Amino acid sequence: LRVVGGNLTAKQLAKIAEVAEKFGDGHVHLTSRQSVEIPFVKLEQIDAVKAALAEGDVEPGVCGPRVRTVTACQGEAICPSGCIDTYALAKELDARYFARELPHKFKFGITGCQNNCLKSEENDWGIKGGIQVKWREEDCIQCGVCTKACRSGAITHEDGKITVGESKCNFCGRCVK
């Protein structure tokens, strides 16, 4: 089924459960790509299944050489480490590219921070959120919290100035949260 960024509404979940009971064997499979499958549906019932799912705003997914379900972690909306709105980006990519035919299957994966829970590099096009930090003297109160928060040791504090070592920074954003 088409699941954008791993998000389904309660209405969609209820309809999927209803269809699984009526046309399948009463269970669903949650795929590794954040989608849902209803196994054991008879081929001659596919049109009825699609119609029933549409009543709950659920659309079929795709297979074969096409752009697949866009996966995303929960991003900044829920995760304290999140740096970007992963769901908004997933919806945008889905609207532009979902089911587009290509020479081979194609997967998007969006992760909101450097924790990389979605393993963005394992997708054909992976997006990893981050924050590029610049020190502004007029905004700094010299408290040292940013230096302590930086796990990669990219931030140093000397002679009243903060330096962000770009080669060490992993763009996690902990220093500004």
Could you tell me what each predicted segment is?
Residues R2-V133, D139:
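Small-residue-enriched alpha-helical segments and adjacent helix-cap loops
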Residues I84-T86, D124-K128, R151-T163:
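Short cysteine/histidine-rich zinc-coordinating motifs and their immediately flanking basic loops
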Residues W135, V164-G165:
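Hydrophobic face of beta-strands forming the core of extended beta-sheets/solenoids
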Residues V145-I162, K168-K177:
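Iron-sulfur cluster-binding cysteine motifs and their immediate structural context
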